[in-house]
Amino acid sequence: MVVQKSVVKSRVFGELEVSEENIIFFEEGIPAFENLKKFVIVKEDQSPFYWLQSVEDKDIAFVIINPFEIKPDYEFDLPDEVVNKLEITSAQDVAVFCIVVIPEDVKQTRVNLKAPIIINVHKRKGIQYLLDDERYPLRYYLFENLNSDEQK
């Protein structure tokens, strides 16, 4: 089997050689970036963070994190519409990430728990889904919450 590879240009990483099978297709794009449909996940070494890099625009890359690493009790149900759209057949098909905003004052780093990125890892399809759940904020302050969890 021949695996097609592409060179993806990235402002963060320079040139990345990416297998076509690692490209994730977001049919609806990501809110505010609806015109961008193809992304690839790049792992940061020795870090809980990943990058969701646009294949189509080198300047667009989101820092993302697995929310279960920072909030082990994070849970939600996906509606059938999303399950069908992503062709999910089992929980093993799914990877969940949340977008991270890291401002100049790193202590103000926040995670969007309200709108996780759901990926079917086998079908390479993704969506950013807005949860109808008041438990999860748009701005979950990472360091503030980690410190309060450690004190418990």
Swiss-Prot record:
Keywords of the record, alphabetical order, are: Bacterial flagellum biogenesis, Chaperone, Cytoplasm, Translation regulation
Query: An example Gene Ontology cellular component term from the record?
Result: cytoplasm
**Do the record's keywords include Cytoplasm?**
yes
Q: Name one Pfam family in it.
A: FliW
**GO BP annotations listed:** bacterial-type flagellum assembly; regulation of translation
Is-annotated flag, keyword Chaperone?
yes
The UniProt entry, under InterPro entries, shows: Flagellar_assembly_factor_FliW, Flagellar_assmbl_FliW_dom_sf
Task: Specify where it is mainly localized.
Answer: cytoplasm
Q: Where is this protein localized, as stated in its record? A: Cytoplasm
Could you tell me the superkingdom of the organism this chain comes from?
Answer: Bacteria
What does UniProt give as the signal peptide span?
none
Write down the HAMAP family for this protein, in alphabetical order.
FliW (MF_01185)
The entry's family comment says: Belongs to the FliW family.
Subunit relationships: Interacts with translational regulator CsrA and flagellin(s).
Function, in words:
Acts as an anti-CsrA protein, binds CsrA and prevents it from repressing translation of its target genes, one of which is flagellin. Binds to flagellin and participates in the assembly of the flagellum.
Record protein name field: Flagellar assembly factor FliW
Q: Which organism is it from?
A: Caldicellulosiruptor bescii (strain ATCC BAA-1888 / DSM 6725 / KCTC 15123 / Z-1320) (Anaerocellum thermophilum)
Top-down, what is the taxonomic lineage of the species of origin? Answer: Bacteria, Bacillati, Bacillota, Bacillota incertae sedis, Caldicellulosiruptorales
